[in-house]
């Protein structure tokens, strides 16, 4: 039996199984040991079953796949060769695990006889991602003693675990050489595949799992709790779940606190600012019940409120993950937000607390005055909605600007906002944004800090393949300005935290053949944005700001509002 042919047979079953689990995108890094998997992915692409994407940097590739999976809400497969290529996927795997994004990670491996004996490019790959995958599938090297039915069943069991929990399935696949010289005809006619002939021409799983949909029932004490003083807090949510929360909370007369990731239009905007007011915060803590939809809040003030609240606490979140870092004694509903709302009709009543609305109105005027008309981080955050396309998506990086956007920006209802707030790292942000563009096939606005951009420069190569207008805003405040918030000596802060780079991104844009613009005023920016939307390509828009302007304004807003005296 030809080893190279059977390697392909083994890979064929793996890839065909994943396609039947919803995979339509395969992200591939170059490498020799992964050749059997790569060639089968190419065959599936030629058959119209998948789209293959390539990238030379495995770390970026992992985040690119993450972005596609976020945008399509479907699992994505990743193929890499053996050795440290596999380890470079770790950051993306961590982020996927934290946020329940489904990835199938296929790591080619040397065969067991080459482990721990000094063989080239052989590292210990079994279970190498620890507890971060929802399932680790450590396959033997291809062997006809194992039936194809066994291989399918093993993979589908792992896929079922993924559907239940959300996250990564790691499939480690050792291959013995030779890896080449197998023709499609030799593979398709191999006797090992004969029991699968009917399955191979059908687009259905080997094991049919009937998942029972649990109906969301009204809480037995809802008639009691809906008469009380409540606060609705909304974190990161899929766009389709955001609809209706605002009107439901308004009908109840309850205070609504929203995260920029929620897709919910706030009734009292600028929560991250006005929650700094101690008088209002103390009144808010007198609520009888808090109902939280989603999780992973950006706002420090919302997090502080949640931590301080000691009353009745309900959490509505579909993933089943533990998403209460303050360990409330709570009632948990594993449900989608809109399903829960249907089961819990509102009781129409007047607002129980008027100060948030009054303070929010004061903030609107005060913030406009403080931000001014110059092109700065704060003005970009405040006026970001004017730059967004009607049918587009927004990706926010993990820098000072994401806090400013969360504090100052008001987006249209259910406008798609993507972030990497599982581990909130600065790695892979460009790659994730590129993946979201490919996966959504919509215009993208990505707003990323300069340090984050430097950390992921290789991923600019991924934007060559975008087919929709893509605007990459790089906020260049000469280093990690978010660290200005720390109570650290200025000299120490520069040397060990901010790390000024004193550079710009014009030559980087040229290197990756990207359109580049460096607007100085809002008039310049509006012109640049108009031109960028006329092209189905990526444009790098560098916004240079003074290092401390954004953080200073943010701190000033918080300080001024914290002492404001507002009558209801």
UniProtKB/Swiss-Prot annotation:
Cofactor(s) demanded: Mg(2+); Mn(2+); thiamine diphosphate
The record's free-text note on cofactor binding: Binds 1 thiamine pyrophosphate per subunit.
Keyword Manganese: yes
Stored SUPFAM superfamilies: Thiamin diphosphate-binding fold (THDP-binding) (SSF52518)
Signal peptide range in chain numbering: none
Keywords for this protein: Magnesium, Manganese, Menaquinone biosynthesis, Metal-binding, Thiamine pyrophosphate, Transferase
Gene Ontology terms describing biological process: menaquinone biosynthetic process
Annotated InterPro entries: MenaQ_synth_MenD, MenD_middle, THDP-binding, Thiamin_PyroP_enz_TPP-bd_dom, TPP_enzyme_TPP-bd
Pathway: Quinol/quinone metabolism; 1,4-dihydroxy-2-naphthoate biosynthesis; 1,4-dihydroxy-2-naphthoate from chorismate: step 2/7; Quinol/quinone metabolism; menaquinone biosynthesis
Reactions accelerated catalytically: isochorismate + 2-oxoglutarate + H(+) = 5-enolpyruvoyl-6-hydroxy-2-succinyl-cyclohex-3-ene-1-carboxylate + CO2
Gene3D superfamilies documented for this protein: 3.40.50.970, TPP-binding domain (3.40.50.1220)
Top EC category: transferase
EC number(s) on file: 2.2.1.9
Pfam families, sorted: TPP_enzyme_C (PF02775), TPP_enzyme_M_2 (PF16582), TPP_enzyme_N (PF02776)
Gene Ontology molecular function: any one: magnesium ion binding
Subunit structure: Homodimer.
Entry similarity comment: Belongs to the TPP enzyme family. MenD subfamily.
HAMAP family according to UniProt: MenD
Function: Catalyzes the thiamine diphosphate-dependent decarboxylation of 2-oxoglutarate and the subsequent addition of the resulting succinic semialdehyde-thiamine pyrophosphate anion to isochorismate to yield 2-succinyl-5-enolpyruvyl-6-hydroxy-3-cyclohexene-1-carboxylate (SEPHCHC).
Name of this protein: 2-succinyl-5-enolpyruvyl-6-hydroxy-3-cyclohexene-1-carboxylate synthase
Species, as recorded: Haemophilus influenzae (strain 86-028NP)
Gene name linked to the record: menD
